[in-house]
Structure formats: structure tokens, C-alpha cells
A protein has these predicted regions:
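Positively charged n-region of N-terminal signal peptides that target proteins for export
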Residues: 1-4
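Bacterial N-terminal signal peptides
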Residues: 7-16
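Boundary at the C-terminal end of the N-terminal hydrophobic targeting segment
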Residues: 19-25
Length: 218
């Protein structure tokens, strides 16, 4: 089986969120709809939603009890959004967006840390995390050859946020996984508009798992 780089899982930890959670404008989102709604439909979503989780079988891990959702969204203010691309027999990929709080993340940066257990990965933004100890954008997960699309989408998202009119540098954080076994990864089907759509769809509450978003082709 091909090695899947999941460097993000052990690399970026949201330690706390700023108290301010004012809503901001979302100027760039309309661009996502230019691709058509059909591109974002997930015919496998119902399968993912019904699959039992490990704890449903009585298997327990760790010494701490999970939150009520047993998801990253148990942390107040965190939201997650997915875009899943399933087209024909060859496209099985997508995007997962993690937003640590609903305010202006560039202005209200979130403490973070980086540690590489296996450096065979393409985690964009890791060097500034090590240098400054924070993140200033949401976190995007996608396939290995679409990291650049993730960066482009996050830069657009950040520049268009209300209050960021003077921003000239953005440390976009994008993790990846290689879905080339099931997906036409060389086709680079994920575009910046898909990144923006995943950010727009991000919400608190239960999180779809499995073959959805960035996990579709893995």
C-alpha cells in the first residue's frame, strides 16, 4: 500500500482560541459557485454518516473521556467543512477545512506547535509555526499535488476578510495526504474555489468522517 503522509495529524495543535468571535464578511466565497453545485455533491456521504465508529464497538483508547461529539468541534469555536469530488471512475479527492474560531484569524492568531514524526510530507506553513508558535489562517487538508491550490485559496480567503486591507504576507497552513491509488492525482482536480467552498461550509457540531473531504481517496 502506498505510504500516506498524514503529517498534519501530529504537527498542528490548536491550543486555545481568542475570546473574540465576531462574525466577518466572506467576500471571496461567491467564486466557488462558478464551478457548479454538482461538483461539490458527495454521493458517499450517507455511507460515511452511517458507519459505526470504534467506540461504538466498545473499543476505548487513551485515559481521557471524549467530548460529547468525540470530534475536534468539541473545542468551542472550532468548525469543520468538507468538499468531496467524485467524478467518473478516476476522481476521488476533496478538501477539508478546519477553522479554529469564527473571528479574524489573521488578527487573532491561534497558538500552535509543530513536530514532525515523519518528515516525508508537504505541510505548507510549518516553518513559521515553529518560528512564531501560532497559526494565522484556517487549516486546509487536501491531496498531495493540490497543496498549492490550498495555499491559493487560503491567501484569497485571508486577503478578502474584513480588516485585512493592509495584509501583504500570509502563512497558509495546508496539510496533505496522497490519494493517488484511487484518485487521478496528476489531474489536480482540486481548485482554489473548492478551498473557498469548504471554508464556507465549515460549521460546528458533528463532523462527517471517512470517505469525505480530504479523506475521499484514501
Amino acid at each position: 500500500m502506498k505510504h500516506f503522509s498524514l503529517l498534519f495529524i501530529v504537527s498542528v495543535f490548536i491550543l486555545s482560541a481568542p475570546a473574540s468571535t465576531q462574525a466577518q464578511s466572506h467576500g471571496p466565497y461567491d467564486a466557488a459557485h462558478n464551478l457548479g453545485e454538482s461538483a461539490f455533491q458527495n454521493p458517499l456521504a450517507s455511507v460515511s454518516a452511517k458507519r459505526p465508529r470504534m467506540r461504538d464497538y466498545g473499543i476505548r483508547t487513551g485515559v481521557m473521556q471524549p467530548g460529547p461529539l468525540n470530534a475536534i468541534t468539541d473545542v468551542k469555536g472550532v468548525s469543520v467543512g468538507h468538499v468531496t469530488l467524485v467524478e467518473g471512475d478516476s476522481v476521488r479527492t476533496g478538501v477539508t477545512a478546519i477553522i479554529p474560531h469564527p473571528g479574524n484569524i489573521f488578527r487573532e492568531k491561534v497558538p500552535a506547535a509543530f513536530w514532525a514524526g515523519n518528515g516525508f510530507g508537504k505541510l505548507a506553513g510549518s516553518t513559521q509555526i515553529k518560528e512564531l508558535g501560532n497559526i494565522e489562517t484556517p487549516v486546509i487538508l487536501t491531496n498531495t499535488l493540490s497543496v498549492s491550490a490550498g495555499v491559493e485559496g487560503l491567501v484569497t480567503y485571508t486577503l478578502e476578510r474584513s480588516g485585512n486591507g493592509d495584509v501583504q504576507s500570509v502563512n497558509a497552513v495546508v496539510g496533505e495526504t496522497n490519494d493517488g491509488e484511487l484518485n487521478d492525482i496528476r489531474g489536480r482536480h482540486v481548485k482554489a474555489a473548492h478551498i473557498l467552498d469548504a471554508l464556507k461550509k465549515a460549521a460546528p457540531g458533528p463532523v462527517a468522517e471517512g470517505n469525505v473531504g480530504a479523506g475521499t481517496g484514501t
